[in-house]
Swiss-Prot record:
One MF annotation (Gene Ontology) recorded for this entry: protein-containing complex binding
Residues modified as N-acetylalanine: 2
Designated name of the protein: Serine/threonine-protein phosphatase 2A 55 kDa regulatory subunit B alpha isoform
Self-association state and partner proteins as the record states: PP2A consists of a common heterodimeric core enzyme, composed of a 36 kDa catalytic subunit (subunit C) and a 65 kDa constant regulatory subunit (PR65 or subunit A), that associates with a variety of regulatory subunits. Proteins that associate with the core dimer include three families of regulatory subunits B (the R2/B/PR55/B55, R3/B''/PR72/PR130/PR59 and R5/B'/B56 families), the 48 kDa variable regulatory subunit, viral proteins, and cell signaling molecules. Interacts with the PP2A C catalytic subunit PPP2CA. Interacts with the PP2A A subunit PPP2R1A. Interacts with TP53.
Record has rRNA processing as a keyword: no
Tissue: Expressed in all tissues examined.
Keyword Ribonucleoprotein annotated: no
SUPFAM superfamilies reported in the protein's UniProt record: WD40 repeat-like (SSF50978)
General function of this protein: Substrate-recognition subunit of protein phosphatase 2A (PP2A) that plays a key role in cell cycle by controlling mitosis entry and exit. Involved in chromosome clustering during late mitosis by mediating dephosphorylation of MKI67. Essential for serine/threonine-protein phosphatase 2A-mediated dephosphorylation of WEE1, preventing its ubiquitin-mediated proteolysis, increasing WEE1 protein levels, and promoting the G2/M checkpoint.
Residue ranges of WD repeats: 11-80, 94-174, 175-218, 227-270, 288-325, 347-381, 414-446
Native source organism of the sequence: Homo sapiens (Human)
GO CC list: cytosol; glutamatergic synapse; nucleoplasm; protein phosphatase type 2A complex
Gene: PPP2R2A
Alphabetized UniProt keyword annotations: Acetylation, Repeat, WD repeat
Amino acid sequence: MAGAGGGNDIQWCFSQVKGAVDDDVAEADIISTVEFNHSGELLATGDKGGRVVIFQQEQENKIQSHSRGEYNVYSTFQSHEPEFDYLKSLEIEEKINKIRWLPQKNAAQFLLSTNDKTIKLWKISERDKRPEGYNLKEEDGRYRDPTTVTTLRVPVFRPMDLMVEASPRRIFANAHTYHINSISINSDYETYLSADDLRINLWHLEITDRSFNIVDIKPANMEELTEVITAAEFHPNSCNTFVYSSSKGTIRLCDMRASALCDRHSKLFEEPEDPSNRSFFSEIISSISDVKFSHSGRYMMTRDYLSVKIWDLNMENRPVETYQVHEYLRSKLCSLYENDCIFDKFECCWNGSDSVVMTGSYNNFFRMFDRNTKRDITLEASRENNKPRTVLKPRKVCASGKRKKDEISVDSLDFNKKILHTAWHPKENIIAVATTNNLYIFQDKVN
């Protein structure tokens, strides 16, 4: 499987697993988002309990190639608390829907995190010195009586144990009527967008009390509503361009230079439906759960229920590549509809060189597709392979007929074990995969 480096086949091996082993998982511990920062040295996860946990790549071990995939807890903080909307009598969950890192400009790191309604800008900074020797203040912070000061001292900085502080710098609230599903930082690093089911807003990172509505698909009569916005993202290089996907399987590319309200798209990406595949579930499974631009900005990837599609921005009428993630589930759509799994929102990600794409599946399986060799592989995130440097064995699912020894039957897949969130290190072959409440880190095997 090709990775950040290019076309050679890669053996993936286990590096770490984070989180408790319990079968009885608390709802608050379920991981809801995973994101590497721009250098890959930090990895953030958000959970349903409103917490953000940041892991840092082991600095000493970066030189030792077999330990590159070791991450240790750097900072943990409560990003969002549960709230109650008294006007609508609605509870607002604390669950973190998305995390996005800003590029590092100084010693501190900044990230955006959002729940259903409120976006917060967090500053993550280190402190390893503290001031000492104030004239009018005791070491515990109490003020002295100025009349007791007989000599003047020059305050000095003394070394202390490293402290990592997370402080909220901005809170962007009261701009979304519906649940926020996406945030995306613009390539100008000054603005970002936030999208809910029917609207997309544009924000400036310094201004919290005002945002511009750039897309509004809400009909005058809500009975005429036929689709909702499912994801949105800014282009990585062109600061005026963004895309948003819909529950009908379409992707619209908009140019903010054309008009203030981008209700008219510049391009519409849509694949004509094959009439022979039409069924009751067609519209549900064509809903796009994630859209991601390639690092180069030439392509974008979309994930629907059964497949991953790669689109060339210059070709709207069909994708240039389609990869079947779990086609063997097509015959199971009826039972997946009954247990609500058909509404699961799987995400997808690119590797650093845009040559491989990755997405999750059921039974704690995740899939990789090599765009150059057209090879694909299914791997499993499991504690059975949890010795460091254990090479992951490819898994195969048997759809029908006789099952070979190393295959797993489609009927024995566990639909409660699912990988919705994955992330790929921007520069190395290190991947982070979230199962229910565990974070697995895998890396390529280096001889």
